[in-house]
A protein has these predicted regions:
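A short, charged helix-loop
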Residues: 180-184
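ATP-dependent adenylation/nucleotidyltransferase module used to activate substrates
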Residues: 11-176, 186, 194-203
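Aromatic (phenylalanine/tyrosine) cluster motif
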Residues: 3-5, 11
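Mid-to-C-terminal catalytic subdomains of enzymes
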Residues: 205-209
């Protein structure tokens, strides 16, 4: 299945600034509008990566968003402001079709057959780190980064997923990623606790909660 990536839905591109030690390796940073993904992007900028922020539109932002939901119109604005603070480009990409076919439809099908599906796992596997990687390829990005609390370890047989902060561990949400996906994944918050993330947000001038 082919997907069309719609660049920038109504938001200006912010030019990135780097220091003399910037390594210049391009990274697509998934930005939900929350503090975790914003800090993850900020830490990568500090390390010298060429960071491109991306927020994924999973459904029409005119529809009412429930508490704790992602990708509402306010999330787009929060992500845009965080990207502007960090001095990086920001795009909103239309993944509504991919989300519906790979997450919603699968959830309904599994539920009808008596299974207990986890839509977050499917979303990360097929959309955030599946389809998003295609966008990374398109713009010449080597890695995709997220704000998950999980770690990656280098073993003799390749990359392995490991638990992050026990209180906030989110490695389960990435458990179905294939080795080739893990090899191109960056998890800047893997060794941090939530309080440390918030401290980094304050230091970076990020105002998201």
């Amino acid at each position: 299945m082919a997907f069309e990536f719609a660049p920038l839905i109504g938001y200006p591109v912010c030019r990135m600034t780097t220091d003399s030690n910037a390594r210049g390796v391009r990274v697509v940073a998934a930005m939900s509008g929350g503090v975790d993904s914003a800090v993850a992007a900020g830490l990568l900028v500090e390390r010298g990566y060429d960071v491109v922020g991306v927020t994924m539109k999973m459904y029409a932002p005119t529809k009412p968003a429930h508490a704790k939901s992602c990708c509402g119109s306010e999330d787009f604005d929060d992500a845009r402001r965080s990207a502007a603070t960090l001095g990086i480009p920001h795009y909103v990409l239309d993944f509504e079709e991919a989300f519906r076919s790979n997450v919603v439809d699968r959830f309904v099908s599994d539920y009808r057959t008596g299974r207990t599906p986890n839509p977050c796992v499917a979303c990360n596997n097929f959309v955030k780190l599946g389809t998003l990687r295609r966008f990374a390829d398109r713009i010449g990005a080597r890695f995709v980064a997220t704000g998950h609390y999980a770690r990656l370890t280098h073993e003799a047989d390749g990359m392995h997923l490991a638990m992050g902060d026990p209180v906030k561990d989110q490695s389960y949400a990435l458990a179905q990623l294939a080795p080739d996906q893990l090899a191109r994944l960056l998890l800047p918050l893997g060794k941090l606790e939530k309080a440390e993330t918030r401290a980094h947000a304050a230091r970076l001038g990020l105002t998201v909660a």
